[in-house]
């Protein structure tokens, strides 16, 4: 095998291995803690003729009439159909803190797979656009289904490809969400804005494309927070995380959510 072919194959393999979150169902993915209720159901968007499965996590304790909504978008799951259940360590934790948590299944088995070649910002843009449309649809449907909750604040959380679509959302649909928190999105540029507030947790083994992350000057100007985690592989930012990694992610996310508006 010549050098050029070896190099090409290596590059292709590297892209394949780092192109999606790589999360798998965890043993606890189908079990919710006693303090948290889980309700899974399908929403159907008639305008787009699309099924959107969701999982709603709520505390079983006293619920605030003015709950804050958190929408979680999973990393690329190769159309497995259950990737929205790969983040129970986070969704259950936030539900216990009183948040109304909705995890969205963005990929369906009948969807096309995300392209592994080409310029990501071009070939993957339609997938992010669809994800942003899913998020908007779910927000509207949840508000109708739970009219007594108020939902005074809405936050988007997204891992990897889900972070890319979460970063796109406020740029496509401004004025709807209050905060976005991404877990190591690497392709879609984070919005440079003070509303929504922008936060991002960065892995210890992957880098973002040029222009995705704000400069130090932009962070200071807009109040954006980019946190580099020392021992946090990209593929561990889900239920595959160790107990220590889960605790670290939850700690940062809760701090971001509790940060007051300026």
Per-range role (PLM):
Residues 8-18:
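Bacterial N-terminal signal peptides
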Residues 20-23:
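N-terminal Sec signal peptide cleavage junction
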Residues 25-65:
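N-terminal cap/lid segment of alpha/beta-hydrolase-fold proteins
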Residues 50-149:
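Serine-hydrolase catalytic machinery in alpha/beta-hydrolase-like enzymes
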Residues 140-194:
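Primarily recognizes the serine-hydrolase "nucleophile elbow" in alpha/beta-hydrolase
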Residues 199-202:
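Short beta-strand/loop motif that positions the catalytic acidic residue
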Residues 207-214:
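Conserved alpha/beta-hydrolase "acid-adjacent" motif
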Residues 223-262:
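C-terminal catalytic histidine-bearing segment of alpha/beta-hydrolase fold enzymes
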